[in-house]
Regions:
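Polybasic, low-complexity association/targeting segments
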Residues: 57-77
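Amphipathic alpha-helical interface segments
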Residues: 87-91, 127, 140-216
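Helix-adjacent hinge/juxtasegments
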Residues: 111-148
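A short glycine/serine-rich beta->alpha loop
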Residues: 69-76, 107-115, 186-191
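N-terminal amphipathic/hydrophobic targeting modules at extreme N-termini
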Residues: 5-7, 20-24, 30-33, 40-43, ...
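Short, positively charged and aromatic/hydrophobic N-terminal segments
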Residues: 12, 40, 44, 51, ...
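Acidic-glycine-rich active-site phosphate/pyrophosphate-binding loop
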Residues: 58-61, 89-106, 175-179
Length: 216
């Protein structure tokens, strides 16, 4: 079995995988299955040579991202995925810590553990809304601009993880959902990629802010 290596555009990491573990989904993308720190991961990468135009992704250095590592630290302290990303950016918005924590509390586990949109993504969207969102409901241009922004952020996350949906990222089925959160044990952190996912979401938001400076 021949081992193949592809360079992931996300964290500049190489994934080792055998030919039979690779699946060419479309002419545009290659999905790689690999293993990092004993965790199975999915990384969706551009199949550049088959495209005349490819979407240019952000260059991320998650390990050295201030907000990324702050979000990861919060998650390891017990905050849920949405809270971890949202609270990591507390220095960017004017909101009481308790209120910010409560506001973002419903989105953990893919919306109250429904395993829908990843909580890290929801937290990223909330930060984007506070920093760049519109406050005039009839302003069509601002609304369109903000939705485009959200879709861009979602695209950055999806390109790196194959999906923005919790159950798909974690490889879960569509069985009965349980509202009881998992105990944060050593085993939990060993099998879940969530600490790295919140770090990635926060790093994406950090890079977006760097590329799109806030006024004032």
């Amino acid at each position: 079995m021949r081992s193949l290596t592809r360079q992931s555009p996300c964290a500049k990491m190489k994934l080792e995988c055998s030919e039979d573990q690779m699946e060419l989904q479309t002419a545009d993308h290659l999905v790689l299955f690999g293993c990092i720190d004993n965790r199975k991961i999915l990384c969706q990468c551009h199949w550049i040579c088959s495209r005349k135009e490819s979407r240019i992704m952000m260059e991320l250095d998650v390990e050295n991202s201030y907000y990324g590592q702050k979000a990861k630290k919060l998650f390891l302290e017990g905050y849920n995925c949405s809270q971890s990303v949202f609270l990591a950016f507390e220095d960017k918005y004017d909101m009481d810590h308790s209120m910010a924590m409560k506001l973002s509390s419903s989105f953990g586990g893919g919306m109250g553990r429904l395993r829908e949109v990843c909580g890290a993504v929801s937290g990223m969207f909330m930060v984007a809304g506070l920093l760049y969102g519109y406050d005039e409901p009839k302003n069509f241009e601002e609304k369109s601009e903000h939705y485009a922004r959200i879709q861009e952020l979602a695209g950055e996350y999806r390109e790196r993880n194959g999906s923005i949906v919790c159950r798909e990222i974690l490889g879960l089925g569509k069985g009965k959902v349980d509202p009881v959160p998992s105990r944060r044990t050593k085993e939990y952190y060993q099998k879940r990629p969530c600490p790295d996912l919140v770090a990635m979401a926060a790093a994406i938001m950090e890079e977006y802010i760097r590329e799109n400076p806030l006024e004032g």
